[in-house]
A protein has these predicted regions:
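Transmembrane-helix bundle of Major Facilitator Superfamily
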Residues: 1-163
Length: 163
C-alpha cells in the first residue's frame, strides 16, 4: 500500500517537525548537563561553555546555507542529510573520548538541526494547500516552543541518573 501525495506530505512534515523539536531540545538539554560534562572532561566553565556556544554558532551559519543545498538536492536528500548529520553528531557525543570530539559532535548536531529549520518552513508553505499553511506553521511553532522548555528537565534527569 502506498501513501498518497497528501499522506507523504504529512509524514514528511511530522518527521521534520520532530527533528526540529529534537534540535531545540538538544540545545537546551546541555545547559543543565554542562557542570557534569565539564567535570567529566576536566575542563573549566569558560571552555565548557563552548558546547552551547558552538551549537548556536553552527546553527546560525547553517540556516542561510540551506538555500544553496535546496537548489542542488532534492527535498528528500536534504532531509536525509539533516537527519543523518544530527544522528551521527549524537552518536559522536555519546561516544566522545575527549572534549574536542564532543564539541565536534555538537557541531554535527547543530548543522543537522540548522538544515531542518528552513526545510520545515518550506514544507509548510509549499506542500500544504494555501488555507492550511498557517495551521502547519502553528503546529511547527508548538513543537518548537515546547521542546526547549523541557530540555533542562531532561538534562537534569540524565545527570541525576547517570552522573
Amino acid at each position: 500500500m502506498s501513501l498518497s501525495e497528501k499522506g507523504r506530505t504529512y509524514v514528511l512534515f511530522a518527521i521534520v517537525v520532530l527533528a526540529c523539536a529534537l534540535g531545540s531540545l538538544t540545545q537546551t538539554v546541555m545547559n543543565s548537563m554542562l557542570g557534569g560534562v565539564e567535570a567529566d572532561f576536566g575542563v573549566n566553565a569558560s571552555v565548557g561553555q563552548w558546547l552551547t556556544t558552538i551549537y548556536m554558532l553552527a546553527l546560525g551559519i547553517t540556516v542561510p546555507a540551506v538555500t544553496f543545498l535546496s537548489q542542488r538536492l532534492s527535498l528528500r536528500s536534504v532531509v536525509f542529510l539533516a537527519l543523518g548529520l544530527f544522528l551521527v553528531g549524537g552518536i559522536v557525543d555519546v561516544l566522545a573520548p575527549t572534549f574536542g570530539v564532543l564539541v565536534f559532535g555538537r557541531v554535527l548536531q547543530a548543522v543537522g538541526a540548522g538544515i531542518t529549520l528552513p526545510v520545515l518552513q518550506s514544507i509548510a508553505m509549499t506542500r500544504f494547500p494555501k488555507g492550511q499553511n498557517g495551521t502547519a506553521m502553528g503546529i511547527a511553532g508548538i513543537a518548537m516552543g515546547f521542546a526547549p522548555n523541557i530540555g533542562p528537565l531532561i538534562g537534569g534527569a540524565l545527570v541525576d541518573s547517570w552522573g
